[in-house]
Amino acid sequence: MKKLRTRYAPSPTGYLHIGGARTALFNYLLAKHYNGDFIIRIEDTDVKRNIADGEASQIENLKWLNIEANESPLKPNEKYGPYRQSQKLEKYLKIAHELIEKGYAYKAYDNSEELEEQKKHSEKLGVASFRYQRDFLKISEEEKQKRDASGAYSIRVICPKNTTYQWDDLVRGNIAVNSNDIGDWIIIKSDDYPTYNFAVVIDDIDMEISHILRGEEHITNTPKQMMIYDYLNAPKPLFGHLTIITNMEGKKLSKRDLSLKQFIHEYKEEGYNSQAIFNFLTLLGWTDEKARELMDHDEIIKSFLYTRLSKSPSKFDITKMQWFSKQYWKNTPNEELIKILNLNDYDNDWINLFLDLYKENIYSLNQLKNYLKIYKQANLNQEKDLDLNDAEKNVVKSFSSYIDYSNFSVNQIQEAINKTQEKLSIKGKNLFLPIRKATTFQEHGPELAKAIYLFGSEIIEKRMKKWK
């Protein structure tokens, strides 16, 4: 049995998007589950729209997500490469001309105005969907030769009549499309660049791709691609078309929707846990047989069955992704966090207490950095208008009177809180909020005694002076 090979083939016209990351992830999981190979190749023929760091964004951010390719432009295998379409232009052109020689394709000499005229004629006839008619263009043989000599033509593949293109979709089951709904279509544009549906087939054949998981927008591309496989007498891969990802209102994710971060680098920069996103994206259109949510990298690979891919759209719930990231960060050893954030200069006991206290409630490292900043800048921030009412001031004064700065510890601070509670017969928010505001200058936070202790006796004593 031949090795299972999957691929992710982005265009470097933009950065790695949530949808692209999920597509790459599912192809990666399918390959790894069956001990196959996962390939990244770059479809960079849309030169005008390519951006300088588009390719790097795709590969580097996938690597950050722990989605590493067996082969890519950075790890080429000569047997299957090149891994950028821009390096294969001559090959696409050569195969297109071979199809002409075999009678499967032809040169189409229409210019843009003539093609537009044919479309308008089709509309007048009431044709719902335009299909190119190869005998519509009426030009002289002399004009045809002139255009041929100057390369003013595209190459179209001949769409066979009354043919059904059928495949057993890995996600959706049986799908069939009648060729009469397609028409002849362009495989090489007038600038000698290949169209997507032509180049992608050549690439998949060259790289011996056996399974393809991709977005549902590619369903209409599949019969065109199957046509090329047939003309080249090449075995077809198995196709699977994933459902869309929507926002919480059920609308398809749009890159123009600025209310939601949609690019992986944005979550990386904010300090989300990469394995948490890997875990979260896996469940965005796939369910575990045992209904587990939190699974590590190897567990997910072992459990991944494509038969459990969803046929229904998946909602991108940012709150759920934050929950995943929170679970991963709070279970991350302190030593690892110290290394990631370069916190070696801090006192070991202090930084471990800080991390134990705050990592429980963060979903991003930026949050942790902001909490750390509160302590780092404490000396610069000794005064604050707290706007306490008389009852709250009384709580702070009582607490202040019980603190022993010569014996400053978490236990001693907790004892001062307890004595204040007993003296004033209060509890909950009425007890904790005034003390937290007066000592930490925050209204919310983790366990109060520990949060106060981390400031150190000197800073707390200065902040308590006004309450004596």
From Swiss-Prot:
Q: Does the keyword Magnesium apply?
A: no
Record's protein name: Glutamate--tRNA ligase
Task: Offer an example of a GO molecular function term for this protein.
Answer: zinc ion binding
Q: Which gene encodes it?
A: gltX
Quaternary structure and interacting proteins, as annotated? Monomer.
| Physiological role | Catalyzes the attachment of glutamate to tRNA(Glu) in a two-step reaction: glutamate is first activated by ATP to form Glu-AMP and then transferred to the acceptor end of tRNA(Glu).
GO terms, biological process = glutamyl-tRNA aminoacylation
Q: Where would you say this protein principally sits, based on its record?
A: cytoplasm
Highest classification ranks of the organism: Bacteria, Bacillati, Mycoplasmatota, Mycoplasmoidales, Metamycoplasmataceae
